[in-house]
């Protein structure tokens, strides 16, 4: 059997979600790593809970809500400019160092991302990191309105 297509998750598979720590540490010195870890845990928690409750929200909304929760839980005051600068990093996440090499090794296959990310977030991220020239498709769960994994 010949493999014709390979589908990857985006966040945590091709893209290092912890790469936001540099931006969060710049905004809140000494808190960067902690912010990025709590933020990611809240994102996952919110997607799971929303799926179970049948109350879908776009992943960009979840990402914003998760960051607000994180900053407030840590008692960190923030203004709109700081908040938006941190949020912007989510469409400029770092690729894992071996991601492009791994994808290049699969050049005979159709390649795609299937992700909880919103269509707009994923398209911007893929474009900003140059994967738009490598991937054949970027698939968001937006159309199903339920986050993975889904029972």
Q: Language-model features: where?
A:
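Conserved Lys-Pro-Asp/Glu-containing loop-to-beta segment of HAD-superfamily phosphomonoesterases
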Residues: 146-151
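Conserved H-loop
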Residues: 77, 132-136
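Active-site neighborhood of HAD-like aspartate-dependent phosphohydrolases
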Residues: 1-41
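A metal-dependent, Asp-based hydrolase signature
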Residues: 33, 47-84
């Amino acid at each position: 059997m010949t493999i014709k297509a390979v589908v990857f998750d985006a966040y945590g598979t091709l893209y290092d979600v912890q790469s936001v720590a540099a931006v969060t540490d710049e905004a809140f010195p000494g808190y960067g790593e902690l912010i990025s870890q709590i933020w990611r845990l809240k994102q996952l928690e919110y997607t799971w809970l929303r799926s179970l409750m049948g109350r879908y929200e776009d992943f960009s909304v979840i990402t914003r809500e998760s960051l607000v929760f994180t900053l407030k839980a840590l008692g960190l005051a923030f203004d709109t400019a700081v908040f938006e600068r941190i949020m912007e990093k989510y469409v400029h996440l770092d690729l894992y160092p071996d991601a492009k090499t791994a994808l290049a090794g699969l050049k005979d296959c159709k390649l795609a991302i299937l992700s909880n990310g919103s269509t707009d977030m994923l398209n911007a991220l893929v474009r900003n990191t140059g994967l738009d020239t490598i991937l054949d498709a970027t698939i968001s769960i937006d159309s199903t309105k339920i986050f993975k994994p889904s029972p």
